[in-house]
Amino acid sequence: MPIRHLSETIINQIAAGEVIERPASVIKELVENAIDAGATRIEVVTGGGGKTLLRVTDNGSGIPVDELPLAVSRHCTSKLSDDVHDIRALGFRGEALPSIGSVAKLTLKSRPQDADSGFEVSVSGGHLDGPRPSALNRGTIAEVRDLFFATPARLKFMKTDRAEASAITDVVKRIAIAFPHVRFSLAGTDRTPLELAATGSGAEATLERINQVLGKEFGENALAIDAERDGVRLAGFVGIPSHNRGNALHQFAYVNGRPVRDKQLFGALRGAYADVMARDRHPVAVLFLTLDPAFVDVNVHPAKADVRFRDPGLVRGLIVGAIKQALAQSGIRPATSGADAMLQAFRAEGFQPPSPSFTSRPSSAGYASGSWHPAVSSPRTEWSPQTAHPAHRPLDLGAAPSFQESDQATLATVNVLAADARATRDEAPVELQQKPLGAARAQIHANYIVSQTEDSLVIVDQHAAHERLVYEALKNALHSRPISGQMLLIPEIVDLPEEDAERLATHAETLARFGLGIEQFGPGAIAVRETPAMLGEMNVQQLIRDLSDEIAEHDTSEGLKAMLNHVAATMACHGSVRSGRRLKPEEMNALLREMEATPGSGTCNHGRPTYIELKLTDIERLFGRR
C-alpha cells in the first residue's frame, strides 16, 4: 500500500483514541473548558452511563458565533500563544471538541455574555453543520449523544453503565475540589444527584468543599499542610495515620489547579507515611502544588494526567518533609472513625440498651442483673520484680515507687461500691485526667490499658504503643551516636539458608550501628555476639530471622536511610513490652506520658492504631442516657 495522507476524519478519530477513552474523559474535557471560560456554575447531565447522553451547561464567557466552527476544528484554541511552556489553562491543545465530534454526535450551543442571542453548531462523525440560531441563556451548552457510534469497536471495551457513571462522578468530584468557588451539579447517574454549592476561596473554603466531596469525617481527621521551598508551594490537607483507606481512591493531587494522577506525587505521599501506616492501607490526602508553569511539563500525556517536573527531587522532598512535619506536630489525636467502629460493634444485631427498671435475679458469679454483689476477693499480695515471672516484670520506663498489686482474681472482682482506703488510694489524680491520654485505671487481659480523661475513656494496646516508643528512640539514638551493645556470655548461633546468611553478613556494619554484633559462622549460620543494650532481653533467633527477611525485601529497592528505618522497626517489635505482661499503675501512666511526648505515637510501626478513644457522650448513648 502506497504512502498517502490520511483524511481529516481519520486523523481526528485517531486523536480521539488518545484523548477520549471513555465517557468520563468527555466530561473531563468539557468541564475543564467551562472552567477555562470563567464559569461559576456548571451542570452535568448523563444518560446510559454516559454512552447515550453527556451534557455540560455553564455560565461562562461563551463563544462568539464566528468562532463556533473553529471551536470544533482541530488545533484551534484561544488558550495558547506561541510559548508552549507557559501553560496556565486546563485545556490548550484544541483537540477535545474535534475528537469528540469525530466519534460521537456533538452539539455546541453558546451565547456570549454581551450577545443578544445564541448560535449552535453540530458535528456528527466528523461532519460539521451550522452555525444556526439557538435559544439559550448566556453561557455554553455542550451536548454529546451516542458516544463512539462512529467507532463501534470502542463500545466493546466500555464497562457497565454503573461503572462508567461512577467514573464520571469521580471526575466531577476531582475537578470540583480544586475550584470551590464554582457550583457543580451532576444528575442522571442512577444515584442521588450530586450538588456541590460554591464555598468561596481560601483554605477554609477548600476544606468545606473537600468535606462536601469526602464527607465531614475527613475534615475531623485532617491536618493542614502549607509549605514552600525554592518557589514550589505545597498546600492542602492530609489525614492522620489512623484515618486511612483500603485503596488509593481518596488521594487527590493537583498541579497548578490541574487534577493529575502522577505516580511520583503519590509515591512521595506514600513515603511520608512509610513508618506510620500499614503497607496494605492508604492515606487520605488532598494536595495542591503551585509552581512556575515553566518548571513543569503538562504535555507528556494525551489526557494530561501525568506531569514531569524539572526538579523531581525537590518536589518529593517538599511533600515528604511537609507531611512528616505535620504528622509530628499533630500530637495525640485519635481518628474519630475508631470510636465509630467501636460503637458499631456494640450496636451489633441483637444488642439492646439496658432498661432502667427490671427484676434482679441472683447469679452464681456473685452479681445480679440490676445490682452487683462481688464475690469474696483473694488476699492482696506483695508484688516483687524479683519474684515475678519474666513476662510479668515491670516495664523500664523510669524509677517508680513500689506498690501493692492484687492478683488476677482480685482485679476481676473489684468492689466498685466500697468506699474504703483502697478506693481512695486508687483514685486517679485530677491533673492526670487532664492529660490527652488521661490516667491509667486498669489493665485488662494483660494487654490493654484502660485510662480515663475528663470526658472520655481510652483503651491502649500496650505492645503497639511501646513498639512505637522504642522505634522512635532507636531512630533518635542513631542520629546522635551508634547504639551501645551488650556482649553475650555465649554467642547465639542462628541457622539460616546460605544465601540469607551471606546477605545478612554483608550488612554487619549497618547492624553494628544498632548495637547488634553479628558475623558469619560457616556457610549457613550467623553468630550473634552482641545485642542492643537498650532493648534488654529478646528472642535473638526470631530477631535475626525477621531481620533477614526485612533486608531481603528492601535491600535493592531502597536507600540506606530507609533500610535503617526498617531494621529499627523490626528491632522495636522484638524489644517492646509483650502482650500478656502485667504492668504496675505507675508503669502504665509512664507509658501514657511517653506516648503524649512522642511524635507518631497514634500508630505502631506496622500502622495499627495504638489506642482508641470513646467519648463520654458516646458511652451515654450506648446506655440510653442520650
UniProtKB/Swiss-Prot annotation:
GO molecular-function terms, A-Z: ATP binding; ATP hydrolysis activity; ATP-dependent DNA damage sensor activity; mismatched DNA binding
The UniProt record lists the keyword DNA repair: yes
Pfam family of the protein (one): MutL_C
GO cellular component terms given for this protein: mismatch repair complex
Family note: Belongs to the DNA mismatch repair MutL/HexB family.
Family matches, as HAMAP family: DNA_mis_repair (MF_00149)
CDD domains linked to this entry: HATPase_MutL-MLH-PMS-like (cd16926), MutL_Trans_MutL (cd03482)
Residue ranges, compositional bias (Polar residues): 378-387
Annotated region (Disordered), positions in chain: 352-399
Descriptive protein name: DNA mismatch repair protein MutL
Keywords for the protein's UniProt record, in alphabetical order: DNA damage, DNA repair
Function as written in the Swiss-Prot or TrEMBL entry: This protein is involved in the repair of mismatches in DNA. It is required for dam-dependent methyl-directed DNA mismatch repair. May act as a 'molecular matchmaker', a protein that promotes the formation of a stable complex between two or more DNA-binding proteins in an ATP-dependent manner without itself being part of a final effector complex.
Gene: mutL
PROSITE patterns (alphabetical): DNA_MISMATCH_REPAIR_1
A biological-process GO annotation: mismatch repair
